[in-house]
Structures are given as structure tokens and as C-alpha cells.
Amino acid sequence: MARPFFRRRKSCPFAAKDAPKIDYKDVRLLQGFVSERGKIVPSRITAVSAKKQRELARAIKRARHIGLLPFIVK
């Protein structure tokens, strides 16, 4: 009998060898990890590892500070 509430764990999208580098200038990549309201999406939803989530948050905040990403979306 299969486990009824068992979900397979997603792997980190930045763990592969050919995965994209997290860079604050890569706005297209960063927008995938920001909600419609401009908030950073938590790692339990995006399945990003803790280390890469910190790098991602730092890159998003840096991009916001220099004006590449908005702080809030109306």
C-alpha cells in the first residue's frame, strides 16, 4: 500500500552542474523567486537549499537597492 501523504522532495534548482549562477544583474532569473507583490518566495515553496536561498535573497536585495527590481508592486 502506498503512503497516502508522502510527497517526493523536490531538488534544488541550483544544485545541478549546468544550473544558472545566482547574480544580482540577472533580473529574469530573480523574478522567478519573487511573488507578484514583490516579496521573496520562501524556500519551502521553491525547493531551494538554505545556502542558495541566502544567496538568492542577497542578490534580490542588491538588485532592489540599485533599481533593477522593484521593492513593491502595485
UniProtKB/Swiss-Prot annotation:
The lineage's top-level taxon is Bacteria
Report the protein's function. Answer: Binds as a heterodimer with protein bS6 to the central domain of the 16S rRNA, where it helps stabilize the platform of the 30S subunit.
Could you cite one Gene Ontology molecular function of this protein?
A: structural constituent of ribosome
Q: Which Gene3D superfamilies match?
A: Ribosomal protein S18
**Full protein name:** Small ribosomal subunit protein bS18
Alphabetically sorted, this entry's keywords are:
Ribonucleoprotein, Ribosomal protein, RNA-binding, rRNA-binding
List, alphabetically, the PROSITE patterns matched. Answer: RIBOSOMAL_S18 (PS00057)
How is this protein organized at the quaternary level?
Part of the 30S ribosomal subunit. Forms a tight heterodimer with protein bS6.
